[in-house]
């Protein structure tokens, strides 16, 4: 009996050690995303008129509570750090599992970028916070392809991020923005850090066509919105870099009966 108890205790200690080592070694700045996902799913079902999805350009740049105070509609910011287009599409689909918004905002900073047949990174990793459903399985299949080792790394981060032992720093122990803070701000995560920025003239930006992989995801978003009678607004947040897809997004929006808003150039408001 003592041997059995000893074996069980050892197994428990090893299991707990692996779990917490994996937590310590997970990529920096992903804990916020886990809290953001938990916060969103703690909200009452069907309680928001407007939901925004996208990268840090939205979750750090769109104060939805101020929108509510000014205009009276309920809104939630379901953006997270980094986010290539297929990650944003996953969050969009996940949002509709519990909410029935009238308007969806999709931020388009990374509209040309899609994770396909790639190794695990921090962005893909934090989607672990989203529970299993068809859209998530499709997302992981697109990200990982047929490589089973990538799935193993996804579920056991100790295997994927063991090299982080040499990069453990303050942020490895940081608890991030709390679930309660996200709940109070309805997903918005602002900052009091101000950096003077010069916005370039958009008329000088090279314009490119959208990749086929991006168009397929945009079509998916449009079709889901049409089926659910949701008004769809794509928008691009002004920033100091060069954005090459404002013309393509304006054309796409016009062709698909939705809206594209580019605050830098109001000629792209359709």
Predicted features, each with a name:
Residues 57-139:
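Membrane-embedded segments
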Residues 267-270:
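Conserved small/polar residues in nucleotide/adenosyl-binding loops
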Residues 41-66:
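Short extracytoplasmic
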Residues 26-41:
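Alpha-helical transmembrane signal-anchor/signal-peptide segments
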Residues 82-86, 211, 238-245:
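Acidic-and-aromatic substrate-binding clefts and catalytic sites of carbohydrate-active enzymes
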Residues 6-23:
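Hydrophobic membrane-insertion alpha-helices, especially the h-region
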Residues 233-263:
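Substrate-gating cap/lid alpha-helix
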Residues 121-228:
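Secreted/periplasmic serine-hydrolase-like ester/acetyl group-modifying domain
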